[in-house]
């Protein structure tokens, strides 16, 4: 219907894959009717018949920064930053498209 969303940004890739599966069961076409984006770029995201558009984050760097912070805290050191921002990358694959045209939008 006209109030149906045109896109879903899921918290992670596995949730995005579940959204795609449910959408298809409901007769909703991805990406023609609904764009779906995940987060993490897990291996399954690129191996599907319709590869998932996702946000890739530097997992190894994320782990090493977290470990460095834990070791600093265990050594009694004060952390300069409690929040660290690492770069991400949009990986466009087969589950996103411009929103469909419909009356009233």
Regions found by a protein language model. Name each.
Residues 1-104:
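Flexible loop/turn connectors
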């Amino acid at each position: 219907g006209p109030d149906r969303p045109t896109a879903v940004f899921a918290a992670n890739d596995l949730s995005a894959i579940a959204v795609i599966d449910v959408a298809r069961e409901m007769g909703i076409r991805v990406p023609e009717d609904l764009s779906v984006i995940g987060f993490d770029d897990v291996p399954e995201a690129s191996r599907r018949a319709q590869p998932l558009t996702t946000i890739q984050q530097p997992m190894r760097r994320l782990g090493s920064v977290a470990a460095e912070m834990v070791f600093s805290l265990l050594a009694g050191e004060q952390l300069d930053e409690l929040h660290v921002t690492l770069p991400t990358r949009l990986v466009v694959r087969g589950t996103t498209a411009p929103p469909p045209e419909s009356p009233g939008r």
